[in-house]
Amino acid sequence: MQIVDFLIALLPALFWGSVVIINVFVGGGPYNQIRGTTLGTLFIGFSLLATGHAAFDNLTVIIVGLVSGALWAFGQGNQLKSVHLIGVSKTMPISTGMQLVGTTLFSAIFLGEWSTIVQVVMGLIAMILLVVGISLTSLKAKSEGKSDNPEFKKAMGILLLSTIGYVGYVVLGDIFGVSGTDALFFQSIGMAIGGLILSMNHNTSIKSTALNLIPGVIWGIGNLFMFYSQPKVGVATSFSLSQLLVIVSTLGGIFILGEKKDRRQMIGIWSGIIVIVIASIILGNLK
């Protein structure tokens, strides 16, 4: 593995971790954000079409691409709703952990990816670590005491819905044997359609939607780097490195967006991120 390939393999985490930061930074609320972001992915989709990287000769690829893209839009839209309620630095570690749990369990149970005792044991250890990591990143501020936070409870329900969308997006290609590179153009179409459906009954502005095109383009570029790096450094390494997005987004929420955390929460966030990253490395090496 060359150092350049390794550095390129880090770029998906940087790009994907920046998406929600930019969404919040440019503003517009979750419906402008999801509409703009999903339309932004079209720029990457049409660039693939223009360069001959989209084929229309396989109906399965087209349908899987459209449906999985719409599922991603559903997941992303609900993630943005959670961000609106509890912030980036609390949403992203929880959302990342939930996605890892969901995709791993689905792949293990329905796709038979855990075929040996070692894989089962290591997979269960990773699951436990993910739960611990999510719990650590969700610590309340000392001043909050033991009082219930209705916004946090609402956000957790929204993130469960978000996870369903994200898991569907990830596993659908595996179920039907469709590669991400083949489906990417059609996924961008599905994402745009999904984003429009999610936002159609809500007030949106052209300016805010236009500004939120930027994170959509950035997400798409991150995807291209992911597909480039996988054959260079391996699926396990590229997957594990991509999960570092949780560090980018969480710290961006705190230091760029100015989300306030006390010392107890900062310790919990750092500890939780480390545990989640360790779990993702274990899961990556089970692939």
Swiss-Prot record:
Primary site of residence: membrane
Cellular compartment(s): Cell membrane
Domain of life: Bacteria
Keyword Cell membrane: yes
InterPro entries reported for this sequence: Sugar_transport (IPR010651)
Function text: Involved in the uptake of glucose.
The protein, known as: Probable glucose uptake protein GlcU
Organism: Staphylococcus epidermidis (strain ATCC 35984 / DSM 28319 / BCRC 17069 / CCUG 31568 / BM 3577 / RP62A)
